[in-house]
C-alpha cells in the first residue's frame, strides 16, 4: 500500500529569460495546487467512508448478516487489498477518472468493513477520537510539508516497522495477548504518525516533477496514501479513546 507509483518526470518548462514569470515561483504555486487536490480528494474519500459506514451500521439486517457470515468481512478485506493493488500498479495505465472511481470504490468498501465500530463504541468516543486523529494527522502532515529535513531514512524504517506490526497483529489473533495488543496499539499510533509526515513529503516532492497530464493521477495516489494513514491512525487511537457500549 505504500509502494507508490511515481509519475514520469517533469520534462521542464520552456521559460524564456525575458519572461515575467519566475520558474521557482511557478513550481511552488503548482505544487501547492496539487497538494490542495490531494487533500480535497482524501477528505472526500473519508466522507464516503463515514457515510457508508454509518448507513450500514444503521441497518440491523446488514449488521446481522455481517455478524453471522465471517466470510463476508474477509471478502471486503480482500476487495480492499485488490483495489489498492490495482490503483498502485495500474495508475499510469488508466485514466484519471478511472483511478478516482477506484479510489472512491475503495473508500466505500472500507466504510462497509468499518460499520461495526459504530455498534461497538459510543458515538461520543468515536467523535472525540476523530478530532484527536484529525489534529494529530494535520500537525504531522504540515510538518512533512514544510520541513527541510529529508525523511527518507525515517520513512524506510517506518515501512519495515509497519511490516513487523502486521506480523505481530496476525500473531496476536491467535495468542490474544493483552500485553502484546497494547504494544501493537502504541506502535501503530507512532508508525502512522510518522508515515503521515513521510507520505506528505513524498507527495510534495513528486508534485514538483509531475507533468500536467499526470496531476490527476498523483492526486489520487497521494489521497490514497494519506487516507490510509488517517484511517489506520484513527483505528489505533480508537483503542485508547474509544468507550465500549457494553
Segments the model singles out, each with a brief description of its role:
Residues 1-246:
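A hydrophobic alpha-helical transmembrane-helix feature that marks the membrane cores
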Amino acid at each position: 500500500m505504500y509502494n507508490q507509483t511515481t509519475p514520469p518526470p517533469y520534462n521542464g518548462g520552456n521559460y524564456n529569460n525575458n519572461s515575467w514569470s519566475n520558474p521557482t515561483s511557478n513550481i511552488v504555486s503548482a505544487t501547492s495546487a496539487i497538494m490542495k487536490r490531494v487533500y480535497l480528494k482524501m477528505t472526500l474519500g473519508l466522507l464516503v467512508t463515514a457515510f457508508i459506514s454509518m448507513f450500514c451500521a444503521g441497518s440491523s439486517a446488514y449488521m446481522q448478516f455481517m455478524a453471522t457470515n465471517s466470510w463476508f468481512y474477509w471478502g471486503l478485506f480482500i476487495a480492499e487489498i485488490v483495489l489498492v493493488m490495482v490503483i498502485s500498479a495500474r495508475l499510469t495505465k488508466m485514466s484519471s477518472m478511472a483511478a478516482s472511481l477506484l479510489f472512491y470504490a475503495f473508500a466505500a468498501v472500507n466504510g462497509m468493513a468499518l460499520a461495526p465500530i459504530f455498534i461497538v463504541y459510543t458515538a461520543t468516543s468515536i467523535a472525540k477520537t476523530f478530532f484527536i486523529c484529525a489534529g494529530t494527522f494535520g500537525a504531522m502532515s504540515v510538518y512533512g510539508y514544510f520541513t527541510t529535513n529529508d525523511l527518507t531514512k525515517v520513512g524506510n524504517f517506518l515501512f519495515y516497522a509497519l511490516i513487523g506490526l502486521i506480523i505481530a497483529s496476525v500473531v496476536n489473533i491467535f495468542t490474544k495477548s493483552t500485553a502484546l495488543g497494547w504494544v501493537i496499539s502504541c506502535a501503530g499510533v507512532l508508525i502512522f504518525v510518522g508515515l503521515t509526515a513521510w507520505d506528505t513529503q513524498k507527495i510534495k516532492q513528486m508534485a514538483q516533477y509531475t507533468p500536467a497530464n499526470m496531476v490527476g493521477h498523483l492526486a489520487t495516489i497521494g489521497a490514497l496514501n494519506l487516507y490510509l494513514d488517517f484511517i489506520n491512525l484513527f483505528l489505533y487511537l480508537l483503542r485508547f479513546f474509544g468507550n465500549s457500549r457494553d
